[in-house]
Amino acid sequence: MDSKESLAPPGRDEVPGSLLGQGRGSVMDFYKSLRGGATVKVSASSPSVAAASQADSKQQRILLDFSKGSTSNVQQRQQQQQQQQQQQQQQQQQQQPDLSKAVSLSMGLYMGETETKVMGNDLGYPQQGQLGLSSGETDFRLLEESIANLNRSTSVPENPKSSTSATGCATPTEKEFPKTHSDASSEQQNRKSQTGTNGGSVKLYPTDQSTFDLLKDLEFSAGSPSKDTNESPWRSDLLIDENLLSPLAGEDDPFLLEGNTNEDCKPLILPDTKPKIKDTGDTILSSPSSVALPQVKTEKDDFIELCTPGVIKQEKLGPVYCQASFSGTNIIGNKMSAISVHGVSTSGGQMYHYDMNTASLSQQQDQKPVFNVIPPIPVGSENWNRCQGSGEDSLTSLGALNFPGRSVFSNGYSSPGMRPDVSSPPSSSSAATGPPPKLCLVCSDEASGCHYGVLTCGSCKVFFKRAVEGQHNYLCAGRNDCIIDKIRRKNCPACRYRKCLQAGMNLEARKTKKKIKGIQQATAGVSQDTSENPNKTIVPAALPQLTPTLVSLLEVIEPEVLYAGYDSSVPDSAWRIMTTLNMLGGRQVIAAVKWAKAILGLRNLHLDDQMTLLQYSWMFLMAFALGWRSYRQSSGNLLCFAPDLIINEQRMSLPCMYDQCKHMLFVSSELQRLQVSYEEYLCMKTLLLLSSVPKEGLKSQELFDEIRMTYIKELGKAIVKREGNSSQNWQRFYQLTKLLDSMHEVVENLLTYCFQTFLDKTMSIEFPEMLAEIITNQIPKYSNGNIKKLLFHQK
């Protein structure tokens, strides 16, 4: 309302002043026509204009004092009031008001001052006192007349619902200062805390608390909360300035792109930002909106999670740059600033700095950029523009950016500590272009070639040859599990020889290799003669067999040498040796079952026939294989059950050992006397599998006879191969078949002792489960005589 509007009741003289002026400080009469009514007290705590212009508020504490008294110095007080108003107006003109703080104060926000109080929709004033009524000077009759006169003279046509306060100041409407839920609650709390009483019955404030609108002279922008009563004050444009939050928040900024959270994060492909100069000297600026930009993609994995896709913030951190997988010649600006991707959780808070050229980029869609953060180096921007293949039309490969004074690795990373004149070292991937070096299968040293059928070094080759030809009886001082490597291969020759046999080394492999080489040379010579004389037809005397023979198949399926695991450091005993032999025999039976199933034609027999043949012949196979190992390794003088268990004469002298060892030594001595070859041994071993059948015959008897005759012929071929076309072939065939017949007597003696130790529980000799099952099934058949021996010669 107008400050000059009279508040005096009709028929009453003017009062020159207020009685409160002398006792309570300076009194200003805002309304010159006010008579005997409200006076305004300006607190003495703000005596100067300078004190009134503090942090967030330029207002003074205004207190109302309703009294019935009057003073005599009204004119002087009015002059002081006018002077102070003029000073305040000049100060407001000199200083531009802070809109954001004014709006915050008008909404009742706490701005952080120590003496500022949140007062709902009211402004915050220094806490000097509260509104109160002077005791003993109250005239409610005059107050009622002043309020009645005020209500008649201050009606507003625009807003008929607005009300005026008892002080004569217009109350701000809800349209000008909308109330939020928090403001209303805060106002109610302040009313309760500041409400005074006079005599315990009179309330200090009316229901609609009046405030002073000291911000009406300020000009609000179109986005002010006063324009919309339904809008939240927190959405005011006065408090939010996008240009203040990020320098890249422009509408046309090329860095602000849309992206999806399920897409890969790939670098931005930007246009050439190098300023182009016309002939006249003017600079041609390219429009960012005309550039087709790809989407900024984000990716999500176990460690990196992007929460706000596509938001990029630019921070000025100084001359920092980085090498990236881009090509071209130009760099953005003279001074690179850090570019960080929001939402990426990076350890240590590091940022990715793009130092790239965008003249002409060739970025494949399935490749990701490689960043290399480089510490700041004072290098001019003109030096940054130099890279390999510079020029606007030239393209550099991915990650080929180069800087002067640095060598670039082939994988795209640059090393700031290398000299520029030193060539870059090759990458690790390109260094190892060839295959890895081949290692010896025995000692893991570098292999020199394939020796005796196995890839070994020269040392193991010589050792194996000397061990076989010298017929050494190696014994391990430990548990037959010594480590054989390049350094410790000479510590234990027994374990080294065992490892050679496990690898498959064989002296016969060298002879076979020589034969194959001779056949290849002969074939090459025949083809050369044919090419020289095309009209001449040559028929070779014997063509090499292209199909594998039965003997070659038997060589392939031959079981490997097994180890007994016998501890030679413990004193020997007959019980411990026999138990170890039984355990070794059980594993050898399992290997024999696999070997028998691999024999050509044997799996065509009935399954019961296969099991019957194995039950009848398992001791034949064990004894004959033992004789062969003893013949090859000790010339038939020792029994080589395993590389780690060799029965010498001392062990043969143990109780219950000599008689059984004597039968087994007979086999090895016969093989030594006849000088049986490896092919002959393989055929004879197969025939021993087919040497015993039940008396009633097999279910597949005819097929069994055919298979047996096939391997008899194969034994004849092995004899011819060894002796050649000589008259002694039949004699040798007789000798070998005679040895096969003698195996029945040897096996009968061994089985008799085996059955005895199995049935005699007092000896406490252990048998493996599979071997015990076979013996249990075989004992009744032998006791009943239900066995038919297939002999070559009649007795």
UniProtKB/Swiss-Prot annotation:
Effect of residue 773 to A: Abolishes interaction with NCOA1 and reduces transcription transactivation
Region (Hinge): 506-541
Residue range(s) of DNA binding per entry: 440-505
Region (Modulating), start-end ranges: 1-439
Effect on the protein upon substituting residue 656 to S: Strongly increases affinity for dexamethasone
Phosphoserine modifications at: 46, 134, 155, 162, 224, 232, 246, 287, 327, 424
Modified residues (Phosphothreonine): 171
PTM-bearing positions, type Omega-N-methylarginine: 24
Effect of residue 28 to T: Abolishes expression of B-type isoforms
GO MF annotations in UniProt: chromatin binding; core promoter sequence-specific DNA binding; DNA binding; DNA-binding transcription activator activity, RNA polymerase II-specific; DNA-binding transcription factor activity; DNA-binding transcription repressor activity, RNA polymerase II-specific; double-stranded DNA binding; estrogen response element binding
Ranges of residues in domain NR LBD: 542-776
Keyword annotations from UniProtKB, A to Z: Acetylation, Chromatin regulator, Chromosome, Cytoplasm, Cytoskeleton, DNA-binding, Isopeptide bond, Lipid-binding, Metal-binding, Methylation, Mitochondrion, Nucleus, Phosphoprotein, Receptor, Steroid-binding, Transcription, Transcription regulation, Ubl conjugation, Zinc, Zinc-finger
Compositional bias segments (type: Polar residues): 151-170, 185-196
GO cellular component, one term: protein-containing complex
Ranges for region Interaction with CLOCK: 504-795
InterPro entries, alphabetized: Glcrtcd_rcpt, NHR-like_dom_sf, Nucl_hrmn_rcpt_lig-bd, Nuclear_hormone_rcpt_NR3, Nuclear_hrmn_rcpt, Znf_hrmn_rcpt, Znf_NHR/GATA
Region feature (Disordered): 1-24, 67-103, 151-206
Chain positions of cross-link Glycyl lysine isopeptide (Lys-Gly) (interchain with G-Cter in ubiquitin): 438
Annotated Basic and acidic residues bias: 1-15, 173-184
Domain notes from UniProt: Composed of three domains: a modulating N-terminal domain, a DNA-binding domain and a C-terminal ligand-binding domain. The ligand-binding domain is required for correct chromosome segregation during mitosis although ligand binding is not required.
Function: Receptor for glucocorticoids (GC). Has a dual mode of action: as a transcription factor that binds to glucocorticoid response elements (GRE), both for nuclear and mitochondrial DNA, and as a modulator of other transcription factors. Affects inflammatory responses, cellular proliferation and differentiation in target tissues. Involved in chromatin remodeling. Plays a role in rapid mRNA degradation by binding to the 5' UTR of target mRNAs and interacting with PNRC2 in a ligand-dependent manner which recruits the RNA helicase UPF1 and the mRNA-decapping enzyme DCP1A, leading to RNA decay.
Name of the molecule in the record: Glucocorticoid receptor
Source species: Rattus norvegicus (Rat)
